[in-house]
Swiss-Prot record:
Name recorded for this polypeptide: Sec-independent protein translocase protein TatA
Residues that span the membrane, as ranges: 1-21
Function: Part of the twin-arginine translocation (Tat) system that transports large folded proteins containing a characteristic twin-arginine motif in their signal peptide across membranes. TatA could form the protein-conducting channel of the Tat system.
Organism of derivation: Ehrlichia ruminantium (strain Welgevonden)
Quaternary structure (record): The Tat system comprises two distinct complexes: a TatABC complex, containing multiple copies of TatA, TatB and TatC subunits, and a separate TatA complex, containing only TatA subunits. Substrates initially bind to the TatABC complex, which probably triggers association of the separate TatA complex to form the active translocon.
Amino acid sequence: MALGPWQIFLILVIILVLFGAGKLPDVMSDLGKGIRNLKQELKDNKLASTEDESNL
């Protein structure tokens, strides 16, 4: 089930209410850093697993 435009809008409004307009850039920055770190860890893990398979 995909999110429609109204659901995305509602989620953004709830986030804005919870964190306020002043903190929103900081929250989004931290979220972006977290996603970037997750992608890097997944990439590193994939590289490590392929190296382990090649050593067999």
